[in-house]
Amino acid sequence: MISVDFSKGLVPTIILDDQNGDVLMLAYMNEESYQKTLETGYTWFFSRSRNELWNKGATSGHTQKVKQIWTDCDNDTLLIRVTQIGPACHTGKKSCFFNLIKEDF
């Protein structure tokens, strides 16, 4: 198995919808949340604001069932394809990326 580089503590983690490849959210994992994700098959992250682990959807029911886990060329960023149940964003939107800044460059 490929080793993820947690030497800086947190690893950016991009979450994609496995059905269509849409970007759902960006969160951070530490080694403990990564291990819990591997063990349970559901996403676990590290909350920088609350300084604690959180299981995505534990409160809302909007869970993320892991389908695939990828790492980048430096092994310090993760991309996880999931089956998303309900919206991924705490605002109720499907994706956390819904604020267009500019287009048509």
UniProtKB/Swiss-Prot annotation:
Reactions catalysed according to its record: 1-(5-phospho-beta-D-ribosyl)-5'-AMP + H2O = 1-(5-phospho-beta-D-ribosyl)-5-[(5-phospho-beta-D-ribosylamino)methylideneamino]imidazole-4-carboxamide
Record family assignment: Belongs to the PRA-CH family.
Main location per the UniProt record: cytoplasm
Cofactor, free-text remark: Binds 1 Mg(2+) ion per subunit.
Lineage: Bacteria, Bacillati, Bacillota, Bacilli, Bacillales
GO-annotated molecular function: magnesium ion binding; phosphoribosyl-AMP cyclohydrolase activity; zinc ion binding
Designated name of the protein: Phosphoribosyl-AMP cyclohydrolase
Function: Catalyzes the hydrolysis of the adenine ring of phosphoribosyl-AMP.
Gene3D superfamilies hit by this protein: Phosphoribosyl-AMP cyclohydrolase
Organism expressing this protein natively: Listeria monocytogenes serovar 1/2a (strain ATCC BAA-679 / EGD-e)
Biological pathway: Amino-acid biosynthesis; L-histidine biosynthesis; L-histidine from 5-phospho-alpha-D-ribose 1-diphosphate: step 3/9
Any single Gene Ontology cellular-component annotation: cytoplasm
Keywords (A to Z) from UniProt: Amino-acid biosynthesis, Cytoplasm, Histidine biosynthesis, Hydrolase, Magnesium, Metal-binding, Zinc
EC number: 3.5.4.19
UniProt cross-references to Pfam families, sorted A to Z: PRA-CH
Residue sites binding Mg(2+) per the record: 72, 74, 76
Domain of life: Bacteria
Quaternary structure note: Homodimer.
Residue numbers binding Zn(2+): 73, 89, 96
